[in-house]
Amino acid sequence: MSRDAKSRRQVLTGIVAGAGAALMGIAAWRTAHSQSVREISIVAQRFKFVPNSIELKVGEPVLLLISSLDYIHGFNVPDLGIRADLVPGLVTPIRMTPTQTGRLDFLCDNFCGDSHEEMHGQFNVMA
């Protein structure tokens, strides 16, 4: 093979590789931007979550930003196996994507006083 043929082959290989990388980058960008993540803030304070009733959609990615005002509360969604401690002054991020319709209960699972059992809420997942 002559030098010119090798040079052309190398140039063509570089062009094909560059085009492939560009297409992969575009595909990744489209995927990342086609499903934006909905952010929902939840505040825990003694005996309540605010809000305590939240509507979600099946397949919609959600980022929960949960904080505590007064105590180390727990955040537990038993049906999804989600659990976290909520430390006052910190925001705890939790990602989730509901996969079916229905009601998902959440609750505080760190005892925080006499009305602790009242500290709960729900996600209502719609189609």
Each PLM stretch: what is its role?
Residues 1-22:
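N-terminal secretory signal peptides and thylakoid transit peptides that target proteins
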Residues 22, 26, 88-127:
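Extracellular/periplasmic metallocenter environments
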Residues 45-47, 61, 67-71, 80, ...:
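Solvent-exposed coil/turn segments that connect beta secondary-structure elements
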Residues 49-52, 72-76:
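Short, solvent-exposed loop/turn elements at domain surfaces
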Residues 52-54, 81-85:
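Beta-strand-rich interaction surfaces with strong enrichment in secreted/lumenal proteins
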